[in-house]
């Protein structure tokens, strides 16, 4: 009887240790989804997200479609939900195309956040936002104005697609600023590269050939901006102001050769980190309503702002925008200080 009791105790102890081990292994899991894989900008964001995951003891999976499509992102969202992920952070290719899948995920208890490019606010809890449309639209025009020093000028807009949320918001604000502050600037065309490097280069060359007297290309897209710079070099257009948003590692050779005088962005590695820290706060049931702040190691304090900062009319408890602390203009003097 005593031996039987000892065996039972040993078995229960072993079971308890096994259960404890399983509990330790069952780390929370977060999926971090870009618009597409294979683009340095998104890879850098994913690196930041995974660094934050390691610091927090959270399993962060970086995966995205090979082409920027709603169907590709929806499939990934559904797969992650079915695999039992606790949170999904997505850079949406469409403001409303992902909403049915994201709402289903939320109904199943999955925390949904967006980064880089937002959905409609009712389809997520928080948007980790690089800058308001007004901030980024103004930044684009101001960079162009630093180089276009004449009253009458011809300007082209060139970016990823006519449906992507973030870039269209920035361009809308940029065009409004041009209309108000540079009425002599003519916007001669708005064209798209659809996040494809080859198509972007072809489109950029087509713009430059079609408008030989073009003064500036404004390209707020990680593929479009280097494509515009490469097109200008291929066609030997040295007098063209080329500005926009991309990563310093991609743009460094164009800046060093003088093809691009300045361009902007934000620290996308930092954006990935903030996204995971905010998701972790949600999973830990920390207060995250408008006005609440979160201290992030190595970054500082970030605060939840209302959706109205982004021009939305939807507000709800547990819903808002977390704005990155700063944006950066890169040029010859500072570009080598950055590595992403």
From Swiss-Prot:
The keyword Signal applies. Keywords: Periplasm, Signal. Part of the ABC transporter complex LsrABCD involved in autoinducer 2 (AI-2) import. Binds AI-2 and delivers it to the LsrC and LsrD permeases. GO terms for cellular component: ATP-binding cassette (ABC) transporter complex; periplasmic space. The keyword Kinase does not apply. Induction: In the absence of AI-2, repressed by LsrR. Induced by AI-2, via release of the LsrR repressor. Disulfide bonds: none annotated. NCBIfam families: PRK15408.1. InterPro entries: Bact_Solute-Bind_Prot2, LsrB, Peripla_BP_I, SBP_2_dom. It is found in: Periplasm. One of its GO terms (biological process) is transmembrane transport. The complex is composed of two ATP-binding proteins (LsrA), two transmembrane proteins (LsrC and LsrD) and a solute-binding protein (LsrB). The gene is lsrB. Belongs to the bacterial solute-binding protein 2 family. Residues 1-26 form the signal peptide. This is Autoinducer 2-binding protein LsrB.
